[in-house]
Amino acid sequence: MEISSKDLSLNEKLKILADAAKYDVACTSSGSSRRGKKEMLGNTEAAGICHSFSSDGRCVSLLKILLSNECIYDCKYCLNRVSNDRVRTTFTPDEICTLVVEFYRRNYIEGLFLSSGIVKSPTYTMELMYQAIYLLRTKYHFNGYIHVKAIPGTSDELITNMGYLVDRMSVNLELPTIDGLKKLAPHKNPKKLVAPIRQIQNGIVDHRLMIGKDASMERSQSNKYLKHTIFQENPYQRIQTGSSPLTLADPSLKNTLRLQNNGKPASFVPAGQSTQMIIGATGESDLQLLSTTQKLYQQYDLKRVFYSAYVPLNEDSNLPALGTAPPLLREHRLYQADWLLRFYGFKADELLSVDRPNFNTMLDPKCDWALRHLDIYPVEINRASYDVLLRVPGIGTKSAFRIVKARKHGTLNFEHLKKMGIVLKRAKYFITCSGKMMYRIPIEEDFITRQLIGEDGKQNWEIDHPQTYRQLSLFDDFNFQSEVTVEDSSKTLFGQM
């Protein structure tokens, strides 16, 4: 159903385009440290851009909207595909600015997440997005966090110019394999999806080298103490993508973007870039998803990879049937595995194999790995290296540091470990203190598996059976409505509400 934007109010547009954006999960903490400035709105430092989350972990402190839900493409999995009969509308750049500034002044939001369907062409769509962001930064002096989805197939110049205005950019790969992409989005070219990712990476590296930093993005401190991590492999090699990322196409941007007020080079995508992959729409295994994730971190230095459990929205023989529950527990396990790649020194081919390509969703991936390597357990807490401690279920990066530091001053026992925050309900099956286990526990896979599943059963059920999925509203956070009373009106008039 086509309804002209002229027929819709700004509030009606907002309801449509905010709802259409809720399936995009690539929102996270800003990663920027830009302070507030005099005569400018917003900052990315004061309280942390993502201090508020919904029950399923999605960030709600950004105004997350689409520029438009119109689209020339017909991706089978997408609610906004051209063949769907939906109300279509598009924000103007000025309308986006109005929304961001007004919501920010009312303390509803701290930043903007902007994506879009493809209106007319990728370049035309990106031009509209660029106009909105440029106005926010220059006319409205908005200094808050901005995350923009780059449109594959757009011009290199637009991506370059946008990179100087935003904190984070991302390009959705959508699916982890070429076969999956051909099946559900045959019009999308894998090379065109990857090209802007490489261009953004080149721009980030050029800027970092220009200001005297290392080419690679900063990673967790824990990686410095690990002997082997995925980030130590495949060092960055510049691959040209056309025009140089630091050559501005628009000469008018020279003073406003390329140089800050203090004359230093302006940042280019300072919070890094991310991507998103849909899980459950096609038949890829967890191994394929995680292997693709590892390559993205290694080859493109992505800051984050996000996973989105597919919610059946369209009828199609190539998709799960309508009403099929989204694989939320599987999504949760992939996020946990992603954490192991980035902070714990694991690799995809360690966590999974061709023989066992999928995680046991009833166990967290670290427990799953430990149960398949019982030959190295139990680990002696008072002697194990930092690398080995990180591979013990129930011991995290901070806990491992505490153990290494504390045992320099004496022998540790289970009471000490409990005070340090070690999760003994998991760790007790895999560790000893001075050669003794916490209890007499048989080191058998079946026994330990039953115990761990029993302890985590309630949590697993809650993840897989959430309350009805709903993006939190900017207007009605608790999803209830009530009539305005005479007393309310009176309080409003006298400034008591």
Predicted regions and their residues:
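Canonical Radical SAM [4Fe-4S] cluster-binding loop centered on the CxxxCxxC motif
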Residues: I65-D94
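Conserved AdoMet/S-adenosylmethionine-binding subsite of the radical SAM
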Residues: C97, K120-L351
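Long, highly charged, low-complexity intrinsically disordered interaction regions
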Residues: P320-L390, R426-D477
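Flexible, acidic/Gly-rich N-terminal and inter-domain linker regions that tether
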Residues: M1-E70, V423, I431, Y439-M497
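Conserved, mostly hydrophobic/aromatic
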Residues: L62, C75, L114, V171, ...
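Short Fe-S-cluster ligation motifs
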Residues: V101-S115, A337
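Short, charged beta->alpha transition segments
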Residues: L63-L66, D94-R105
